[in-house]
Every structure is written in structure tokens, then in C-alpha cells.
């Protein structure tokens, strides 16, 4: 077709496509200029005077002859992630005729923490959110640049969202752990409101999105995997559907959606071009990937081609957990495939959030470390290399218990005595956390030399003085979050930010309808999750744990229920039968001896896999994940391979949360190898 799958998913395909003179043409499809020539049709050239920024490009021209199929439905959901699967589940319960497009071969990774306000779980725990304070605090985070009417939807409807999901998850054996912890209030320090809203389902298996997939399949629905959004179709001010491309065959499909299109495609965190243009602080301070690399901002771009507006300021969600080796700077590096990636091999090092002493490359303390997750990272963007060093001693376990941080940083506290053995020591062995019997030796291991080493040792001594005084006269950190550096061995590590997602996206109103720059509704177009903006500016309020996901799930449910109230037919069920799925788990029990090879689709192309079988047993599996994200698929693949060998096949082997696309590709390739051996 002239466009590789990898280039297409990067978003570069649009630049090779012609441009419609008057925007998107209804009832047409995207093809490359070279294909148009081969078919004897002329594709327009890109407009030389385009006013669109380079990251956005122009809307593709649409040629009817490129369409292989036309699908008709009432509701089109684009994206099978957290929001998309929630919308699909609610729609399936009501018998709505809908389809779900998903560019990958599996549903998106499940985020397990969601925020819901004054839910039944909260009431059972005796917790109540001060809604007026919550609303005021949320607005303060954005300097008033949010739409409080949109915020109110999450505040007012998230309890119902929880009550909808809870029976589904409980029936699968999952248990909700409602967090009702409070931070200690102190004088002379910013009082952050941390509302009791976090609902954590404390078993990752089965994952919620997989559970919802199975739920809709039981009702006769299915997900159109391996179909990537190309653009939306539009008549006047009304969105009529979308064009998608089958990323395996290259074929184009037009989907006509009579009642609406829901954009649930996530943010643009996996698109370095958009990040560098829209969120320039990210390359200044981020070192780690904790996002789905296939989230390229395509839903945002497609909506903007259809006339939508997006938030004016960035809102990257960055946690202070991007563990790197000494000497590594923040920002992108280019991997062996020529792609921009972040350098850390670790997705998130959770203890990075703990308020221990932090110094820059000059060995100098530069802030009060008792802050929300992104504050140290943002401050480090102004320091050398965009990174900083965290230091603590062997009292780390008791210190963490006293600090009593909230949100997902509490995972470190919950480890108790296992913290050193299970989390810190493995990174010592990996060479990322340094350990020494003296602070001077630690300084050497961390790369401090000359004046910087002198500063580091002086800063450690000063920090001990502040601990003894129980008064941080230098930066004002609360006394209960001071710690001493006196009990060897000592630990030190370098940190940058770990990017989770972007929260700046399409303008929406309180019904999740997408808006134009003139604040007019684009008919039939809706957005949820990180494709829906209007709530976050500059950062994410990390002390509102689970707000991002809770908002996503609530908005998705709201859209479907709104359309039903407006008259979208119910009780119809799916209009198209589900295709036969060839993904059954297999065992090597009756297989012939030999070494077999196959390829599975990963995030960044094919994953070569080989399986060696002897006497009906899998004795060795290799999976080349060098093209996958190191901190995601690169970490998950070794364990998955071990599980496959132990299970003698793929029966009962689960994907690893956070790396489902890579894992699914390996599992499918192993199945293909087993089939060859039967």
C-alpha cells in the first residue's frame, strides 16, 4: 500500500496523503498518493499554505474506490481501553447496536485505581468528601482554567459508576479496597486536600477490561481488533462515522454511525512529535515510559480535522519515579530502530515518591520534598540534566511508615519490611540504586566529583542537623517527613519523571460533546478519557487519587446513557455476527520434536519467537523484544517466557498488566509454533 504499519501508527501516513479542498469528504476513504496513481485516480497535493502545525498535518483526502467494506451501526466506539470498554459494557446491557474499533490486537491495559465521590464503598467506610472543597481545589490546580460543569459530571455521577462496576467485578472474585487514609496536617505548610475517593480492586486477574470484553462477547458483541482510526466522516456539522484501516491487510473500512461516534483513543503520550510541540516540559524532565506507546493522539487529531478545538495548555501526568543510572539525562534518546524513547528500563520505581533528601547534580538540595508527585520533577526541569538524586539510609522502612504518603505511592508503605528485599535490592543488583557503607563512598558511586561531591556531603550533614532540630528552616518540609542519614548502609539513586499520559485534549461540554473553537457542538461527536480535555491544566492533581480513570469511566457511561435518553434504539443487539476468533490457548503435549518459529505483533512491529519442543515438552522459548519499549515489554517478556515453559504452552498463561500488547503478540506466536508441531 506504500505505507508500513509502523509508519501508519506513528501518524506519518497522513503526510503522504492528499488533502481534501473543503475538509473531509463524506463517504470516501484514505489512500496514499502512490496507490491513487496506480488506480488511475488523482490525489491532491498537500496544501502549501496550510495553517495547521506540523504535528497535526492536514485531513486526508478520501477516495471511495479504496473502501473494501461499509459497516453500519448506531454507535461507534473508537478505542477498547478503559473508557471504550466501559461504554461498550453499558451499551451491551441495553442492547444497543454498536461497534468497537481497536488498533491493537488486545484490549487496552486496565488502570486499577479509580476515583468515585461518596460511593457506596465510601459510605460503608464512613468517609465523605467535602464536595465544595473538592471543586474549589480542583479548580485551583488549573488556576481556574477548567470547566466546572464538566467536573460536576464526575462529582455527581461517579458513585453510580462505581455501583455499576462493583457487582461485575465482585462476581469475578475481585475485592474493592477503599482508601480512607488522611495525611497529617501541619502548620506553616500548604494544605493539600486529599479526598477519600480511591477505589482499588486489589487483584489484577482478571483485568477489568478483559472482564468487560468477555461480558460483551457473551451478549453477541465483539471488538474489531487491528483496525486503526484514519479519520472521521462528516456531513455539514454532523459526524457520520469514521474511516478505519485494517493494519494487517491494509484494507480500508467505512463505518457509518447513525447516532454517534465516541472517541476513546487516549492521549498523545506515545507521539514524540506532539509531546515536543505541545508539552515541552516533558523532554526536560521525563526519563521513563509508563504509558501505552500506541497512544499517538490519533483521536484528537481526527476530531480536530473535523473542526474540534483542543485545550490551549498541556497537562502531562508525570510521577517522580523514573529511575536511571548516574549520568543519564532526562529526555528522549533514539533507539536502534530510530525511534525516540525515554532511557529508563524501569516503568516506575515507586519509592521515588517518598520525601527523602533530594539533591541536584551539583550536590545541592533544591526544594521541600514533601510535595505532590510532579513537583520534584518540574523543579528538576530547571536543574542540570533534568534529573535529581534521592538519598536515604537503612531506616528506610520505618521512615516510609512515618511519612505515610497517599495515593499509589502508598504501595511502598504497604510493603512493610519487604521493601528493601523486594523493591530496593533488585535495583541495587541491576546497578540503578547505589549502596555503600559510607556517604563518601556513596557519593563516588553516584558520580559526584570535585565541588559537587563536597556539596553533597555538606548537604547530607546539613540534613542531619535539620532532622535533629525537627525544623526544616531551609525549605519548610514538615518535621514528620524529615529523616536522618546515619545508619549504614546508605542508598542513593537518580530520578527523573515517569510519564503516564497526557490530560490536555478535546474541548467538551457536560454531555461529553466535542466543541469547536467557537464553543459550538459538533453533532454526533463525543469524547472520553484522555481524548477529552477541559479538566486538567499544567499537571494532574495526584492527590486526587484515581480521578483520571474515575472521570473516564463516568464520562463513558454518561455518553451511552445520554444517547439512549435521546432516543438511540435499545434492545436490538449487534447487527453483525462475530467472526471466528483463532486465539485458543494450546499445549505442546502431543507435538513433534523440533524448533519452530513464528512472529507476533507487538507495539513496534513484529516480535520473532522460537519454540523448542522435546518429548511433548517446551524446553526453550525465545522472544526478540528488542523493538519493544524496554520498561514495558522488555520487562514483561522474560517472565512471560518462563510462564509459557512452565505451563508447556499458553493454557492458563496471562498477559502482564502494562504490557498486554507485547505479551499477546508473544502468546499468539507461540500458538503458531505449536500448531506447526502438531
Where are the regions a protein language model picked out?
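Active-site- and interface-proximal helix/loop "cap" or "latch" segments in soluble metabolic
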Residues: 588-678
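An anion/pyrophosphate-binding glycine-rich loop and adjacent beta-alpha core
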Residues: 300-302, 306-448
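Extreme N-terminal leader/targeting segments of oxidoreductases
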Residues: 2-74
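Conserved redox-cofactor binding core of oxidoreductases
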Residues: 156-252, 272-273, 323, 332-336, ...
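Core beta-strand elements of the Rossmann-like FAD/NAD(P) dinucleotide-binding domain
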Residues: 71-73, 250-260
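A glycine-rich dinucleotide-binding beta-alpha-beta segment and adjacent secondary-structure elements
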Residues: 454-539, 620-626
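Glycine-rich loop(s) and the adjacent beta-strand/alpha-helix scaffold that form part
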Residues: 256-327, 542-545, 549-558
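Conserved N-terminal/central alpha/beta ligand/cofactor-binding core
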Residues: 11-14, 40-57, 62-64, 103-222, ...
Amino acid at each position: 500500500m506504500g505505507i508500513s504499519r509502523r509508519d501508519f501508527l506513528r501518524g506519518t501516513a497522513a503526510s503522504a496523503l492528499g488533502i481534501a479542498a473543503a475538509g473531509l469528504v463524506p463517504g470516501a476513504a484514505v489512500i496514499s498518493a502512490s496507490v491513487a496513481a496506480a488506480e488511475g485516480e488523482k490525489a491532491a497535493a498537500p496544501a502549501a499554505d496550510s495553517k495547521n502545525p506540523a504535528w497535526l498535518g492536514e485531513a486526508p483526502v478520501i477516495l471511495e474506490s479504496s473502501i473494501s467494506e461499509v459497516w453500519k451501526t448506531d454507535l461507534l466506539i473508537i478505542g477498547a481501553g478503559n473508557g471504550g470498554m466501559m461504554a461498550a459494557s453499558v451499551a451491551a446491557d441495553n442492547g444497543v447496536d454498536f461497534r468497537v474499533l481497536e488498533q491493537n490486537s488486545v484490549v487496552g491495559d486496565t488502570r486499577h485505581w479509580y476515583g468515585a465521590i461518596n460511593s457506596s464503598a465510601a459510605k460503608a467506610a464512613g468517609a465523605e468528601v467535602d464536595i465544595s472543597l473538592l471543586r474549589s481545589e480542583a479548580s485551583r490546580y488549573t488556576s481556574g482554567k477548567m470547566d466546572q460543569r464538566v467536573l460536576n459530571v464526575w462529582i455527581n455521577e461517579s458513585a453510580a459508576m462505581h455501583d455499576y462496576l462493583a457487582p461485575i467485578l465482585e462476581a469475578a472474585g475481585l475485592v474493592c479496597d477503599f482508601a480512607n487514609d488522611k495525611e497529617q496536617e501541619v502548620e506553616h505548610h500548604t494544605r493539600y486536600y486529599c479526598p477519600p475517593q480511591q477505589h482499588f480492586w486489589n487483584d489484577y486477574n482478571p483485568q477489568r477490561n478483559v472482564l468487560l470484553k468477555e461480558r460483551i462477547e457473551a451478549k453477541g458483541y465483539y471488538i474489531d481488533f487491528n483496525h486503526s482510526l484514519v479519520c472521521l466522516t462528516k456531513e455539514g456539522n454532523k459526524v457520520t462515522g469514521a474511516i478505519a484501516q485494517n493494519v494487517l491487510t491494509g484494507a480500508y473500512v467505512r463505518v457509518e454511525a447513525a447516532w454517534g461516534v465516541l472517541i476513546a483513543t487516549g492521549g498523545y503520550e506515545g507521539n514524540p512529535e506532539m509531546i515536543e510541540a505541545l508539552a515541552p516540559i516533558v523532554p526536560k524532565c521525563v526519563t521513563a515510559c509508563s504509558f501505552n506507546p500506541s497512544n499517538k493522539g490519533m483521536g484528537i487529531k481526527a476530531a480536530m480535522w473535523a473542526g474540534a478545538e483542543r485545550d490551549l495548555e498541556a497537562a502531562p501526568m508525570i510521577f517522580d519515579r523514573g529511575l536511571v543510572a548516574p549520568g543519564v539525562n532526562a529526555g528522549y534518546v533514539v533507539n536502534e530502530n530510530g525511534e525516540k524513547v525515554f532511557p529508563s528500563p524501569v516503568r516506575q520505581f515507586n519509592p521515588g515518591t517518598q520525601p527523602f533528601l533530594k539533591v541536584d547534580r551539583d550536590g545541592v538540595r533544591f526544594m521541600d520534598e514533601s510535595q505532590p508527585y510532579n513537583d520534584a520533577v518540574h523543579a528538576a526541569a530547571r536543574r542540570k540534566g533534568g534529573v535529581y538524586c534521592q538519598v536515604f539510609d537503612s531506616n528506610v522502612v520505618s521512615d516510609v511508615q512515618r511519612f505515610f504518603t497517599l495515593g499509589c505511592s502508598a504501595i511502598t508503605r504497604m510493603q512493610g519490611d519487604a521493601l528493601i528485599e523486594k523493591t530496593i535490592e533488585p535495583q541495587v543488583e541491576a546497578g540503578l540504586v547505589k549502596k555503600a557503607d559510607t556517604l563518601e563512598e556513596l557519593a563516588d558511586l553516584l558520580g559526584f566529583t570535585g565541588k559537587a561531591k563536597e556539596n553533597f556531603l555538606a548537604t547530607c550533614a546539613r540534613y542531619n542537623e535539620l532532622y535533629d532540630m525537627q525544623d526544616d528552616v531551609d525549605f519548610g518540609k514538615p518535621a514528620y517527613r524529615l529523616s536522618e542519614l546515619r545508619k549504614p548502609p546508605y542508598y542513593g539513586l537518580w530520578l527523573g519523571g515517569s510519564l503516564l499520559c497526557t490530560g490536555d485534549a478535546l474541548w467538551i461540554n457536560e454531555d461529553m460533546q466535542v466543541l469547536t473553537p467557537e464553543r459550538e457542538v459538533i453533532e454526533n461527536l463525543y469524547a472520553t478519557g484522555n481524548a477529552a480535555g477541559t479538566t486538567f491544566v499544567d499537571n494532574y492533581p495526584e492527590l486526587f487519587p484515581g480521578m483520571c480513570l474515575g472521570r473516564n469511566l463516568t464520562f463513558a457511561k454518561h455518553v451511552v446513557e445520554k444517547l439512549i435518553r435521546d432516543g438511540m434504539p435499545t434492545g436490538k443487539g449487534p447487527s453483525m455476527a462475530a467472526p471466528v476468533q483463532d486465539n485458543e490457548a494450546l499445549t505442546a503435549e502431543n507435538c513433534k520434536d523440533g524448533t519452530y518459529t513464528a512472529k507476533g505483533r507487538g507495539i513496534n512491529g513484529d516480535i520473532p519467537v522460537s519454540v523448542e519442543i522435546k518429548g511433548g515438552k517446551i524446553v526453550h522459548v525465545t522472544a526478540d523484544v528488542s523493538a519493544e519499549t524496554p520498561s514495558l515489554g522488555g520487562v514483561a517478556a522474560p517472565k512471560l517466557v518462563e510462564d509459557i515453559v512452565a505451563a508447556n504452552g499458553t493454557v492458563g498463561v496471562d498477559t502482564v498488566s502494562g504490557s498486554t500488547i507485547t505479551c499477546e503478540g508473544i502468546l499468539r506466536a507461540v500458538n503458531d509454533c505449536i500448531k506447526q508441531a502438531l
